[in-house]
Structure formats: structure tokens, C-alpha cells
């Protein structure tokens, strides 16, 4: 039997365009997990994270694309790449007879949206940041729906068909997870989880390294996800301590956050969605070089829901960070109140909402 998507009885065919960082890839994976009966293929860029995360799950197609920042010559080269990539994606969409495209933004979204638009293939774009990216602002009007992680984003997208859904996280964040056996943390002992994001966070790691001795002396456990590129940073080393546990990366973040009293984290949209879903209060230290300072804006949205505080990455804020953590350790009732506010603010399962939207858009486009 022919299972191509143009047969109404066949499996729907979805092309996912998500590349680069965990903030783009993990939400798309979370949605894909909700569509087990769909035929899904992936569009990415060579030598990026999707090569490790996606290849064993879905067929992976790659086009050469880069960002728009840089010199006028680089921008001209990026435009040439965009033209070539759009033609490549157009051929892929035609040969694969895809029903619909899902993209989570970033520069890979541009050729995916333009190619789909030229063929009349519907597109669902998810924008997780408060300040939408350039591609979302430029091309969102070509998408059937722009799904938003935060309600505040809509004001930056006039004339776009936007719908607030939250940011998808993996299924394990919605159900209680067993705590990892390799971390012998006694019940009742306070746990701080430090998350630098999928690309690591040298400045955050160094701030934590400076302040952690005081927190350990106060009785806290620290599970520190340093990021692979940061693990050997000599300026981010904390003296060996039985309650300090550094790891470049762990797959059981859901279990860690469900057990944590609070977290110290970058403010990427994916990390914030995981914190919100698990109702984990957080001290947020945004990545200072994020495009258009979008992590700081993301952090303000999280803090506005009553879930923590935000501070800039700076040596001047070392005392503030040290004392804020000590205060939270000494006042667990305040932390519990923040957790309750986050629990009340958590949106429905965004992965399921987006999966349902994909089904609705496909069905309406097939009529």
C-alpha cells in the first residue's frame, strides 16, 4: 500500500526544520514524540547538535545555512546560501510529498518557510522567546499559525496569526521521575541544580564556583550541569566536596528539577519551560551575548510569574548571588510560595497542543 501523504488514508508526512541549539531542537522533538503515527523527517544544518540528537530517530536532511550577523559580505553570502537552501528544500518537499512543515525558528526556518510557501505547503512556526527572532518577524506572516511560548511575544508580531501554547518539553517533565541512584542525596537535604544550557555557560559557572563554598557550608547539595565545553575551565573549578556534583551533561534533568529546592540557570526559553513545568523557582543569570538580549527578556517573563529573580552576569553581582541563595536556603517557606505560583502559572502540555494544531492545519489544508 502506498503510504504517501496525498492518499487521505495514509500516514501524514511532516518535515521538521529545527537546528543548532537545544532550545530549537528539544521542543521539536517533544512535539514529534506526540505523533507516533506520522512519517517524520528532519531538516538541519551540517555539524550541529541535531546530528547527534536526531539522526537515530528520524531521517535527517541537511542544507548549508548561517546567520545574518556580520559584515556586508557575510550577509551577501548568507543570502546566497538562503537561495540555494530554499531550492534544495523545495525539491525535498516535492519529492517527499510532505503535508506540513513544523519549524522552531532560527535561520534554518527561513528556507523551510519560503520553500513551503512557494509550494502551498502549510507551515506551523513555534517561537519560544519573548522577543521573536528575525526569521519569525520577517516570515511569520507566511505561516498558517505562529505558536507562542509566551503571551508577551504577540505584541511584537502585528498582523500574524498567533496563538499562545507554551513551549514544549519532553514527556518525562510531566510525570514524576525516579531520582537517579548515583546521587545519594538524603531526603530533606536542600538541592540546588545549576544549569548552563545546552552550550555551557562559562560566566555563570565561574560565578557559581566563587559562591558555592558558602552554600556547601550551609548544608546544600549542588548538582552542576557545566556544559561539555566548560567542564575543563580552570577558573570554574570548585574544590572537591562530597555534596558538589559536577557533570557536563545529564539526561535526567526532569528528575533533578522535580527534586530540587531551586535552580540557578541561564534564561533560554527551553530551560525556562522546564523550570515552569516542574514548578522550580530559579535565580536566572541570562547569557549576556544572546541576540537582542532575548534571554534577559525571557527572564523577566519568568520572574513576572512569581518564580524567582534575575541578575546580570557580573563580578559585581557575586555577593548578590551568594546572599540570595543563602537567604533561600534559610527561608524554604518563601521558596515554596514561589513554587506554588509557578505551578499555578504553568500552561497545558504544549507538545500535545502543537500536535493537535498540526493535525488541524493538515486537515483544513487537505479540504
Curated annotation (Swiss-Prot):
A Gene Ontology term for the protein's cellular component: plasma membrane
Domain of life, source organism: Bacteria
EC number(s) recorded for this UniProt protein: 2.4.1.227
Membrane topology, record value: Peripheral membrane protein
Enzyme class (EC, first level): transferase
Gene3D superfamilies: Glycogen Phosphorylase B (3.40.50.2000)
SUPFAM superfamilies (UniProt xref): UDP-Glycosyltransferase/glycogen phosphorylase
CDD domains, per the entry: GT28_MurG (cd03785)
The UniProt record lists the keyword Iron: no
Stated role: Cell wall formation. Catalyzes the transfer of a GlcNAc subunit on undecaprenyl-pyrophosphoryl-MurNAc-pentapeptide (lipid intermediate I) to form undecaprenyl-pyrophosphoryl-MurNAc-(pentapeptide)GlcNAc (lipid intermediate II).
HAMAP family: MurG
Protein name: UDP-N-acetylglucosamine--N-acetylmuramyl-(pentapeptide) pyrophosphoryl-undecaprenol N-acetylglucosamine transferase
Highest classification ranks of the organism: Bacteria, Bacillati, Cyanobacteriota, Cyanophyceae, Synechococcales
